[in-house]
């Protein structure tokens, strides 16, 4: 009787353990800023006072002078006159000590200081696509990567996730055939926003 009870208890524990370690191949239903902060901390550790995403970066100051063509075509303060700008070039991920030789996306953010205390901000990546069609897919990919780092998932789990969420695979596929630029200033940056003109 004792052997049977122990055997049933052991099977129950194994069944519970397998269920607890099962990795979802579906993107989460929602993604909040706090979700990303948490997963970046899990993946890269605690770095007080440092941004959680694109943690390693360098800033620069400059000025933006719109072309005569832009001034003639667009009726917007951004193209009306010269403006001081602040730029930040960065490495993707949450590690402030990231290896700049890594084949990873780089970012560029630009803040335009316009008249009347107005600002305009744009951002770009060195990849023509993002790691997911929406925040949920990207968050799911980061969570799979963390589970793999913890030994709770495998490369097969990531492959299944990417098959279920093919948009999350495209950036990694693109990076495999494109080496990073030697310098931030010699890279091509792709806008992460779409602008329509009339």
Feature locations, PLM:
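Active-site-adjacent core segments of small-molecule enzymes
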Residues: 21-198
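Gram-negative bacterial Sec-dependent N-terminal signal peptides
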Residues: 1-20
